[in-house]
Amino acid sequence: MSGISPTELQNLDEPSKKEIMGFLETENSKQKVQMSIHQFTNLCFKNCIHSVQSADLSAQENQCLKDCVNRFLDTNIRIVKGLQSIQ
């Protein structure tokens, strides 16, 4: 993959700069979502799955995972709302 030098970036016209910045912001947002998914997957799996007995989840494991993910999402929503109210 080739990179773009800072000099080449400075030579771009304003619409191109805005397009690149928009692309970078979108990619950054995607990365944050992916990191959150990995984080709660890891956390919830460790909390809810203690041994693998079969290819299917037990009813208890299934409910535990649902509750765990919901708690994780609710917590993140509260944090975001709290941060937004501070700004």
Swiss-Prot record:
Write one Pfam family the protein is assigned to.
zf-Tim10_DDP
What highest taxon heads this organism's lineage?
Answer: Eukaryota
Q: Where is this motif: Twin CX3C motif?
A: 44-68
Instruction: From the record, give the cysteines joined by S-S bonds.
Output: 44-68, 48-64
GO cellular component annotations of the record: mitochondrial inner membrane; mitochondrial intermembrane space protein transporter complex
**What would be an example GO MF term here?**
metal ion binding
Its GO biological process annotations read:
protein insertion into mitochondrial inner membrane
How this chain sits in the membrane, per its record, is: Peripheral membrane protein
> Where does this one sit in the cell?
Mitochondrion inner membrane
Kindly state which keywords UniProt assigns to this record, in alphabetical order: Chaperone, Disulfide bond, Membrane, Metal-binding, Mitochondrion, Mitochondrion inner membrane, Protein transport, Translocation, Transport, Zinc
Q: For this UniProt entry, which residues form the secretion signal? A: none
- Report the sequence similarity comment from the record: Belongs to the small Tim family.
- Subunit info? Heterohexamer; composed of 3 copies of TIM8 and 3 copies of TIM13, named soluble 70 kDa complex. Associates with the TIM22 complex, whose core is composed of TIM22 and TIM54. Interacts with the transmembrane regions of multi-pass transmembrane proteins in transit.
Domain notes for this protein:
The twin CX3C motif contains 4 conserved Cys residues that form 2 disulfide bonds in the mitochondrial intermembrane space. However, during the transit of TIM8 from cytoplasm into mitochondrion, the Cys residues probably coordinate zinc, thereby preventing folding and allowing its transfer across mitochondrial outer membrane.
What role does this protein play?
Mitochondrial intermembrane chaperone that participates in the import and insertion of some multi-pass transmembrane proteins into the mitochondrial inner membrane. Also required for the transfer of beta-barrel precursors from the TOM complex to the sorting and assembly machinery (SAM complex) of the outer membrane. Acts as a chaperone-like protein that protects the hydrophobic precursors from aggregation and guide them through the mitochondrial intermembrane space.
Annotated protein name in UniProt: Mitochondrial import inner membrane translocase subunit TIM8
